[in-house]
Amino acid sequence: RHYYASRGLGDVYKRQDDPVWHEQIFLQQKVLGGILGVEDCWLTMRGLKTMGLRMEQSVRSAEKISQMLEQHPAVKKVNYPGLKSHPGYEIQKQQASSGGAVLSFELADQEAVFAFAEALKIPIAAVSLGGVESILSYPVTMSHACVPKEEREKQGVTDGLLRLSVGIEDTADLLADLTQALAKVEEKIEK
């Protein structure tokens, strides 16, 4: 998603000094045509030129969003390695310069999730579109739809869990949108 800044169609892998691996890749390319087309290569190069700027904005927003969510009474839990409350915070500090642009958080239940998602205006509901927009996904009906409830809950994927991949929109706009959507959740809880 972050390489392209568009809806490009490839992945980048780099592995050196492994002739067996190189032979396998060469065979795959020969048989399946695994080489990106000219336009896909151009999109990748274009995306890499602005990746630093896009990541700075996404990370800055993700940090502020995670802090806001952690303080909000309608949110049960926030999973973001850039928060001091995260169990992996110290390791993350040693390994990375930020907590990244993806976080998850938990609301009370599926009803709260639906009220929240319905009220949102900015994030797109999807698994991934490969663009620069913020994307909200609901693992229960998306990535983990085929996983039995008992197994999914063992993995921490509850009926109230949402995943937010933060895009490059204005931080204040994202915070305002998320806050107003959480207010709708609180209204629903009070009823």
Located regions from the model:
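Conserved core segment of the aminotransferase class I/II
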Residues: 14-73, 117-120
